[in-house]
Structure formats: C-alpha cells, structure tokens
C-alpha cells in the first residue's frame, strides 16, 4: 500500500 511506501521513504531520509 501507499502507507508502506511512505514509511519506507521516511526511513530512507531519516538520518
């Protein structure tokens, strides 16, 4: 779902 994708991107940009 889109929610999962958003969470994935959030983790990627999280530093």
From Swiss-Prot:
Disulfide bonds: none
GO MF annotations, alphabetized: toxin activity
Tissue specificity statement from the Swiss-Prot or TrEMBL entry: Expressed by the venom gland.
Cellular localisation: Secreted
One BP term from GO: defense response to bacterium
Highest taxon in the source lineage: Eukaryota
Keywords (A to Z) from UniProt: Secreted, Toxin
UniProt name for this protein: Short cationic peptide-1e
Record's keyword annotation contains Secreted: yes
Main location: secreted
InterPro entries named in the record: Cupiennin
Secreted in keyword set: yes
GO terms under cellular component: extracellular region
Similarity remark: Belongs to the cationic peptide 04 (cupiennin) family. 08 subfamily.
